Each structure stands twice: as C-alpha cells, then as structure tokens.
Amino acid sequence: MAKSKDTRITIILECNICSNNKKSNFPKSSRYTTQKNRRNTPNRLILKKFCSNCQQHTIYNEIKK
C-alpha cells in the first residue's frame, strides 16, 4: 500500500505575550494543543484564546514542534 499524508496534523499554540515577556512571574508560557487541516489552512494558525498566566484573552501563534 502507498503511504498517504494525513490531512489533519496536531499543532501547538503558544501565547504571544508570555513568550515575548522575559520578566514574567511564570517560567513557562501558556500553550494549547489542537488540530488543523493542512489543506484548508496551509499557513500558520493564529487564534485568540484565554491565557491563564496573563489572565486575559491573548493571541496564540502556531509554533514548530
């Protein structure tokens, strides 16, 4: 059988504010895992989600594994 590429892949989203802020009280930035369809969204995913470290809704960017 031929190998087929999966259209759905698991990605990691990281808080934009926590990752850029080096003076944060928390050593790690907030992260979410989710899935995206490679055919529908070939570019990097950007979502607005709640950050438990910042205590507000912030922008989350897709990062490399």
Swiss-Prot record:
Family: Belongs to the bacterial ribosomal protein bL33 family.
Gene3D superfamilies in the record: Ribosomal protein L33
One Pfam short name: Ribosomal_L33
Upper taxonomic lineage: Eukaryota, Viridiplantae, Streptophyta, Charophyceae, Charales
Example of a GO cellular component annotation carried by this entry: ribosome
First-listed, main subcellular location of the protein, grouped into a coarse class: plastid
Originating species: Chara vulgaris (Common stonewort)
GO biological process per UniProt: translation
Domain of life: Eukaryota
GO molecular function: structural constituent of ribosome
HAMAP family: Ribosomal_bL33
Subcellular location as annotated: Plastid, Chloroplast
UniProt keyword list: Chloroplast, Plastid, Ribonucleoprotein, Ribosomal protein
Protein name per UniProt: Large ribosomal subunit protein bL33c
Regions annotated as coiled coil: none
PROSITE patterns xref list: RIBOSOMAL_L33
